[in-house]
A protein has these predicted regions:
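Hydrophobic/aromatic-enriched cytosolic interaction surfaces used to assemble or bind macromolecules
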Residues: 1-323
Length: 323
């Protein structure tokens, strides 16, 4: 996805989530030239469902981290679209609409043939196919007001956003870089993070369908201790949470496989990444539940000394196209 559109070797990948901000810098878009990485966990409420609730507090935290991360003024920065603020839709327009006018046509269609749950869409798209009558597009839609808040935050820090990507595309890119993918056309990516689970169906790395499952991020369940997150409840509560999510993953896979693919193609590959604690338990639960699927996880990563919980920042850093 390219909400912004290519250039420059240096990479400064910055991922903001409800519970954490992570950063990876590299001389260029590969794992062998990583220079710096770091993270800072956020108290509950500063960012909620991807929206910047306390902008000043987030700004202050980033200002404190900039010297340690060696994130200098005027650096070009890559960011991710918040998962909970993203829609993926298929949409058709008339074949007579010129390619250079497609984005404008999407705004014309909004509220008519393209019904959205918010009024300020920001569109990116890929053309899937076209014939004499129509062009079929795959739309990636975020809220312009939300993305503008992130761009404004970077401006206040004297940083410049030069690319925005989907976390699911970033995760897939990292698995590809690690040579952990096979040739199966359809894959389900499960990103099991502390505050959100993102379940995405991809075809050859292209996100086609996505559902998010919010997880409670509050002081009853989590505490920041010596710069790290710690789970406050018992292990059985954690296991129950994992099992609940696994059943939701199964619902998403079944819906797409039988309602969209009409049962004609099997989704047999699953990629698991995330920053939730007990990733080994998550992988085991998925392996047991989806016994007919090939499960590949971040536990298989080998080519980076950066912790695997940085998976989306690493995948964002690997993005080739920046402005």
């Amino acid at each position: 996805m390219g909400i912004f559109g290519g250039r420059k070797q240096q990479r400064h990948a910055l991922v903001l989530k409800d519970h954490v901000i992570r950063y990876v810098s590299s001389k260029r878009a590969d794992l062998k030239t990583i220079q710096t990485y770091g993270e800072v966990y956020l108290p509950p409420g500063l960012i909620h469902r991807g929206k910047l609730v306390d902008k000043e507090a987030v700004k202050r935290l980033l200002e404190l981290q900039q010297p340690e991360w060696e994130l200098k003024k005027n650096s070009p920065v890559q960011i991710c679209v918040p998962d909970s603020q993203l829609l993926i839709r298929r949409h058709e327009v008339a074949a007579t609409v010129p390619d250079e006018e497609l984005k404008g046509q999407l705004y014309i269609d909004t509220g008519d043939s393209l019904v959205l749950p918010f009024e300020d869409p920001l569109f990116d798209y890929q053309k899937l196919r076209e014939d004499e009558e129509k062009k079929e597009l795959l739309l990636y839609i975020s809220k312009e007001s939300v993305m503008n808040e992130y761009v404004t935050l970077l401006d206040q820090l004297d940083l410049q956003a030069n690319a925005a990507d989907l976390t699911s595309a970033c995760a897939y890119r990292l698995f590809h870089e690690q040579n952990l993918l096979d040739g199966h056309p359809f894959t389900v990516s499960v990103q099991f993070d502390v505050s959100l689970v993102n379940i995405t169906i991809l075809a050859s790395g292209r996100p086609l369908f996505s559902r998010t499952w919010p997880l409670a991020y509050d002081e009853e369940r989590w505490v920041i201790h010596e710069g790290q997150l710690e789970w406050r409840l018992d292990s059985e509560s954690l296991r129950e949470e994992i099992r609940t999510v696994v059943t939701e993953i199964e619902k998403v896979i079944s819906f797409y496989q039988y309602s969209v693919l009409k049962g004609e193609v099997e989704i047999s590959n699953m990629l698991i990444s995330g920053d939730m604690i007990a990733m080994d338990l998550i992988v085991q639960e998925c392996t047991d539940y989806f016994s007919q699927m090939k499960i590949t996880s971040q536990l298989d990563f080998t080519d980076s000394y950066v912790p695997a919980r940085y998976y989306d920042a690493l995948g964002l850093m690997l993005r080739k196209e920046v402005r």
